[in-house]
Design a protein with these regions (language model features):
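Cys-dependent protein tyrosine phosphatase-like superfamily
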Residues: 2, 23-126, 138-203
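Substrate/cofactor-recognition hotspot
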Residues: 132
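Glycine/aspartate-rich loop-and-adjacent alpha/beta segment that forms the canonical ThDP
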Residues: 135
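Short cysteine clusters
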Residues: 129
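Bacterial N-terminal signal peptides
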Residues: 13-23
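Bacterial N-terminal signal peptides that target proteins for export
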Residues: 2-15
Length: 203
């Protein structure tokens, strides 16, 4: 809608009021989502754009769509054969990134995962594996360290809150999280040094 700014100030005031009310209603809706129909084990909300949990049952997909989820990402290697159909029938997108609980995620898997979860068209996403603990815990830790600036200790603490078992059960995955953060931190520091040099050279 076009509003002439100089000749119709009353319309402008009305438009601003409508926009403010709409923004307030949207924020209130996001803050008061109804999770009562979610029965997924180990379910949690990492951010407004990211949910996590265990393998959903058939009844859970409409419930996920009901809280606004647009994309389901399955991290299991041999997930349920009918999951894609159930997800798409509920109006959501489906992706599978096959991971194991005994091997580090590949660079290709990490790149695909971060691309999917950071694409606004896919958000909010729901990320799951079988129990929502190990593969989901690791990939959510990468999300936290990459997007939220968390260090490895902070990310691992959250993994434990969702029942991740590091030693002796899954030492490879735990070590991977700490190694990933070390590499990420080194890259950030190198980029900061390059930025500082560029600023100094421009003066």
């Amino acid at each position: 809608m076009f509003v002439h700014l100089t000749r119709k100030p009353n319309q402008l005031k009305i438009l601003i009021a409508v926009l403010l009310i709409a923004a307030s209603a949207s924020a209130e809706t996001r803050g008061n989502l109804d999770f009562s129909k979610i029965r997924i084990k180990n379910f949690g909300q990492t951010s407004e754009a990211y949910y996590r949990g265990a393998q959903p049952e058939s009844r859970d997909y409409p419930a996920l769509a009901g809280i606004g989820v647009k994309t389901v990402i399955d991290l299991t290697r041999d997930g349920r054969a009918d999951e894609q159909g159930l997800v798409e029938h509920a109006g959501m997108r489906f992706y599978r990134i096959p991971l194991t609980t005994s091997e580090r995620p590949s660079e290709a898997a990490i790149a695909q995962f971060l691309s999917l979860v950071n694409n606004p068209a896919n958000q909010p996403v729901f990320v799951h594996c079988q129990g929502g603990r190990h593969r989901t815990g690791v990939m959510t830790a990468l999300y936290r360290m990459t997007n939220d600036g968390w260090d490895a200790n902070h990310a691992y603490e959250e993994m434990r809150q969702y029942h991740f078992e590091g030693f002796p059960a899954h030492p490879v995955l735990k070590q991977f999280v700490f190694d990933y953060y070390t590499k990420l931190d080194q890259t950030r520091q190198a980029n900061n040094r390059q930025d500082e040099k560029a600023v100094g050279a421009s003066k």
